[in-house]
Amino acid sequence: MPKVRTKDLIEQFQLELISGEEGIHRPIDTSDLSRPGIEMAGFFTYYPADRVQLLGKTELTFFDTLTTEQKQERMKALCTEETPCIIITRNQDVPDELLQASRESGMPLLRSSQTTTRLSSRLTNYLEGKLAPTTAVHGVLVDIYGVGVLITGQSGVGKSETALELVKRGHRLVADDSVEIRQEDEDTLVGSSPDLIEHLLEIRGLGIINVMTLFGAGAVRNYKRITLVINLEIWDQKKNYDRLGLDEEKMKIIDTELTKITLPVRPGRNLAVIIEVAAMNFRLKRMGVNAAQQFSERLMSAIELGNQE
């Protein structure tokens, strides 16, 4: 099922439907837009018919200079069965040739009061958000000091209980159990909760609780950019865990690599506090303050000084 149809654009941007009502369910598969200026001159060799077409003042002013026969020919070529819609900006008058071609092909012809540049920008942002690659990850997403922390780990390791403690400490829950992630940009992942389980948290032995009802609207948020992954795993005595923080793991989600920290879980460890500190330390590293690197440099300086003596 297509993620976006022409009907969605009409509703989202309050566009006026002039003709082609039968085609409002046409799918839109790309966020790229087209301003068919060179096509108006008759060059259709590389016409991107699958894109939303925008006709601004420049295109329609040039169109007025054409002969009647040329106008009919160009508009028939523009209105294909593949084209999602044509949008006329600035509330300009609709050429009769375009109206006729739209009716014959069943292609939606729309109109907006916005300028071409403004509408183009808004359409691109909307379509990129809707058509972005998506995936779902088993885990919990929490906003900690402005850092979107995705807590992962095998079932029963304590992810939801840790999230509950973080919420009690003033942080905000985004999603529990299933985190829907979309890649809005090359390095931007945004996580949210499925509508069915939004603001809900499952605690074994207690059941399902509504975080917003219990802790208020300030304890939840609808979406958050993910910048850090913390993986919880049962403590393995045979495994060597990072004790300095010099080595940085990475986790790839869709096409974006995120910093990953592995936290071993065992009785007596306050995971909520550790994750809080991990988020703050991550922010410090992004600001250029790396405590592990500073310690390493001091250690190397001390060793060199000792060797000189």
Curated annotation (Swiss-Prot):
<keyword id="KW-0547">Nucleotide-binding</keyword>
<dbReference type="InterPro" id="IPR011126">
    <property type="entry name" value="Hpr_kin/Pase_Hpr_N"/>
</dbReference>
<feature type="active site">
    <location>
        <position position="138"/>
    </location>
</feature>
<feature type="binding site">
    <location>
        <position position="202"/>
    </location>
    <ligand>
        <name>Mg(2+)</name>
    </ligand>
</feature>
<keyword id="KW-0119">Carbohydrate metabolism</keyword>
<feature type="region of interest" description="Important for the catalytic mechanism of both phosphorylation and dephosphorylation">
    <location>
        <begin position="201"/>
        <end position="210"/>
    </location>
</feature>
<feature type="region of interest" description="Important for the catalytic mechanism of dephosphorylation">
    <location>
        <begin position="264"/>
        <end position="269"/>
    </location>
</feature>
<dbReference type="GO" id="GO:0005524">
    <property type="term" value="F:ATP binding"/>
</dbReference>
<dbReference type="GO" id="GO:0006109">
    <property type="term" value="P:regulation of carbohydrate metabolic process"/>
</dbReference>
<keyword id="KW-0511">Multifunctional enzyme</keyword>
<dbReference type="InterPro" id="IPR027417">
    <property type="entry name" value="P-loop_NTPase"/>
</dbReference>
<dbReference type="GO" id="GO:0000155">
    <property type="term" value="F:phosphorelay sensor kinase activity"/>
</dbReference>
<feature type="binding site">
    <location>
        <begin position="153"/>
        <end position="160"/>
    </location>
    <ligand>
        <name>ATP</name>
    </ligand>
</feature>
<protein>
    <recommendedName>
        <fullName>HPr kinase/phosphorylase</fullName>
        <ecNumber>2.7.11.-</ecNumber>
        <ecNumber>2.7.4.-</ecNumber>
    </recommendedName>
</protein>
<feature type="active site" description="Proton acceptor; for phosphorylation activity. Proton donor; for dephosphorylation activity">
    <location>
        <position position="177"/>
    </location>
</feature>
<dbReference type="InterPro" id="IPR011104">
    <property type="entry name" value="Hpr_kin/Pase_C"/>
</dbReference>
<keyword id="KW-0067">ATP-binding</keyword>
<dbReference type="GO" id="GO:0004712">
    <property type="term" value="F:protein serine/threonine/tyrosine kinase activity"/>
</dbReference>
<dbReference type="GO" id="GO:0004674">
    <property type="term" value="F:protein serine/threonine kinase activity"/>
</dbReference>
<dbReference type="InterPro" id="IPR028979">
    <property type="entry name" value="Ser_kin/Pase_Hpr-like_N_sf"/>
</dbReference>
<dbReference type="Pfam" id="PF02603">
    <property type="entry name" value="Hpr_kinase_N"/>
</dbReference>
<keyword id="KW-0460">Magnesium</keyword>
<keyword id="KW-0418">Kinase</keyword>
<keyword id="KW-0723">Serine/threonine-protein kinase</keyword>
<comment type="function">
    <text>Catalyzes the ATP- as well as the pyrophosphate-dependent phosphorylation of a specific serine residue in HPr, a phosphocarrier protein of the phosphoenolpyruvate-dependent sugar phosphotransferase system (PTS). HprK/P also catalyzes the pyrophosphate-producing, inorganic phosphate-dependent dephosphorylation (phosphorolysis) of seryl-phosphorylated HPr (P-Ser-HPr).</text>
</comment>
<dbReference type="Pfam" id="PF07475">
    <property type="entry name" value="Hpr_kinase_C"/>
</dbReference>
<comment type="similarity">
    <text>Belongs to the HPrK/P family.</text>
</comment>
<feature type="binding site">
    <location>
        <position position="160"/>
    </location>
    <ligand>
        <name>Mg(2+)</name>
    </ligand>
</feature>
<feature type="active site">
    <location>
        <position position="159"/>
    </location>
</feature>
<feature type="active site">
    <location>
        <position position="243"/>
    </location>
</feature>
<dbReference type="GO" id="GO:0000287">
    <property type="term" value="F:magnesium ion binding"/>
</dbReference>
<keyword id="KW-0808">Transferase</keyword>
<keyword id="KW-0479">Metal-binding</keyword>
<comment type="subunit">
    <text>Homohexamer.</text>
</comment>
<dbReference type="InterPro" id="IPR003755">
    <property type="entry name" value="HPr(Ser)_kin/Pase"/>
</dbReference>
